[in-house]
Curated annotation (Swiss-Prot):
RuBisCO catalyzes two reactions: the carboxylation of D-ribulose 1,5-bisphosphate, the primary event in carbon dioxide fixation, as well as the oxidative fragmentation of the pentose substrate in the photorespiration process. Both reactions occur simultaneously and in competition at the same active site. Pfam families: RuBisCO_large (PF00016), RuBisCO_large_N (PF02788). It comes from Avena sativa (Oat). Heterohexadecamer of 8 large chains and 8 small chains; disulfide-linked. The disulfide link is formed within the large subunit homodimers. Its main location: plastid. One of its GO terms (cellular component) is chloroplast. CDD domains: RuBisCO_large_I. It is found in: Plastid, Chloroplast. The gene is rbcL. The keyword RNA-binding does not apply. GO terms for biological process: photorespiration; reductive pentose-phosphate cycle. Its cofactor is Mg(2+). Mg(2+) binds at K201, D203, E204. This is Ribulose bisphosphate carboxylase large chain.
């Protein structure tokens, strides 16, 4: 060993392994306005103290690795490291803690959800010292928010484009989701739109399969839109799914949709990826297309309470990446979603400023600094009897989407659409008159049945349909 090497080793670098908490657990740290803050639900392995587990999360999701490295001396760890600054036990759990981590903003590329998630929810989730790890919430600082375009248009611009105000929008997913020819698919869209719906929708797994290639579907759906608009005098739309195997193909499909003059396209943002989604959102803003977002694959990530990532984080990420609608659960339908928790992330999608509210699962105050809002879409196992509850829970700035609840009507698609439209208009009118939708909902629907045979038939078919299962993911007591 040369004398120069000996001198450097003796003065600075000390090889070996040391506890993460010696560097990354800093309870005295005062968070900065520019920090990205994260709340992790941490379940350590037996024998691992929570301080070490929380520090390990901060280290492995920022600058740290399993051993000391000499290149630490070539940068400022104090400037760039993540810090576990607070730990609190989870009520009712013996071995779970909420660990709060602050990340300096310089760790992340501007305008890139992909880069943000690669660090914060990257390899650390496979760390052996942790039995389980879940990201519960993120605080995105205004300094980072302003590097994102966000939704292509937002709620108010969509209202203005559609010229529809004062009520939720109505949609329908075309069923069966796979197997129809393009012409029959377009016919189903036309019947639903003519019957009174605002939108019809491709299901998330409708891309370009042998039974129905994307270009044929786009053409027949555009024909359905224009025909229904001419007959009803209302602006109509169909969520044309542009999701594809490559970004180039996805943009090609969006370009064709724009050439057809339709108002909206669709993307599966988790399976498609955040880079693809952000690219499509930029194209949609530049070319006047609304963007509907489906969350296929979300439950793989967010359903288990002790591991993965809560949907409120995926919802925030979508607002940053870009989308005008996103599926959010229904509370009352067939899919997972507790009421207060769902309303918490619905507010995070729509509102400009959201206060911390642990009772609704919101760990941090979030200021979106005028980033456009996203319309939540309630979809999955809902029908006309749910209309009062959906109107009361989600309010006007929402899309209520009835697939089977439209196409399953005994008289056909158009009567199914009419039944939903009548039920919605009745609920909105009753609410505007001061009636209590939660208490009087069934009575309101029965009254409307007297002057709508389509609604009466729908009510008879689905009068006994319920999905009464306890949610897996609940708010901590």
């Amino acid at each position: 060993m040369s004398p120069q090497t000996e001198t450097k080793a003796s003065v600075g670098f000390q090889a070996g392994v040391k506890d993460y908490k010696l560097t990354y657990y800093t309870p005295e740290y005062e968070t900065k306005d520019t920090d990205i803050l994260a709340a992790f639900r941490v379940t350590p392995q037996p024998g691992v103290p929570p301080e070490e587990a929380g520090a390990a999360v901060a280290a492995e999701s920022s600058t740290g690795t399993w051993t000391t490295v000499w290149t630490d001396g070539l940068t400022s760890l104090d400037r760039y490291k993540g810090r576990c600054y607070h730990i609190e036990p989870v009520a009712g759990e013996d071995n779970q803690w909420i660990c709060y981590v602050a990340y300096p903003l310089d760790l992340f590329e501007e305008g890139s959800v992909t880069n943000m998630f690669t660090s914060i929810v990257g390899n650390v989730f496979g760390f052996k010292a942790l039995r389980a790890l879940r990201l519960e919430d993120l605080r995105i600082p205004p300094a980072y928010t302003k590097t994102f375009q966000g939704p292509p248009h937002g709620i108010q611009v969509e209202r203005d484009k559609l010229n529809k105000y004062g009520r939720p929008l109505l949609g329908c997913t075309i069923k069966p989701k796979l197997g129809l020819s393009a012409k029959n698919y377009g016919r189903a869209c036309y019947e639903c739109l003519r019957g009174g719906l605002d939108f019809t929708k491709d299901d998330e797994n409708v891309n370009s399969q042998p039974f129905m290639r994307w270009r044929d579907r786009f053409v027949f759906c555009a024909e359905a839109i224009y025909k229904a608009q001419a007959e009803t005098g209302e602006i109509k739309g169909h969520y044309l799914n542009a999701t594809a195997g490559t970004c180039e193909e996805m943009i090609k499909r969006a370009v064709f949709a724009r050439e057809l003059g339709v108002p909206i396209v669709m993307h599966d943002y988790i399976t498609g990826g955040f880079t693809a989604n952000t690219s499509l959102a930029h194209y949609c803003r530049d070319n006047g297309l609304l963007l509907h977002i489906h969350r296929a694959m979300h439950a793989v990530i967010d359903r288990q309470k002790n591991h993965g990532m809560h949907f409120r984080v995926l919802a925030k990420a979508l607002r940053m990446s870009g989308g005008d609608h996103i599926h959010s659960g229904t509370v009352v339908g067939k899919l997972e979603g507790e009421r207060e928790m769902t309303l918490g992330f619905v507010d995070l999608l729509r509102d400009d400023f959201i206060e911390k509210d642990r009772a609704r699962g919101i760990f941090f105050t979030q200021d979106w600094v005028s980033m456009p809002g996203v319309i939540p879409v309630a979809s999955g196992g809902i029908h006309v009897w749910h209309m009062p509850a959906l109107t009361e829970i989600f309010g006007d700035d929402s899309v209520l989407q009835f697939g089977g609840g439209t196409l399953g009507h005994p008289w056909g698609n158009a009567p199914g659409a009419a039944a939903n439209r009548v039920a919605l208009e009745a609920c909105v009118q009753a609410r505007n008159e001061g009636r209590d939708l939660a208490r009087e909902g069934n009575e309101i629907i029965r009254e409307a049945c007297k002057w709508s045979p389509e609604l009466a038939a729908a009510c008879e078919v689905w009068k006994a349909i319920k999905f009464e299962f306890e949610p897996v993911d609940t708010i901590d007591e």
